[in-house]
């Protein structure tokens, strides 16, 4: 059976708030192992206004932040980390294969 989290439960785990809370739901996770999360991306996201007008794509740095927040949920949902903050220290040789766009 899948473990899922709604936005309120995610907000109990992560310190991020709008507009920088970049995951909307967790479909499944195993504490300390993995997390499958989603961000509902719509055409009116604030970052689309300048990135890029007429051809909006999610900025790569926000894609990395979405991944970091997803990983943080996998770590911070463990009882021993309740109330802690996870920090993503760095990333090397990141490649983006396809752009993320609004539907």
Language-model segment annotations:
Residues 2-4, 70-103:
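Hydrophobic beta-strand-centered segment that forms part of the acyl-chain substrate-binding groove
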Residues 4-10:
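Short Pro/Gly-enriched beta-strand edge/turn motifs at strand-loop
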Residues 50-59, 63-73, 88:
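Compact, glycine-rich, soluble single-domain proteins
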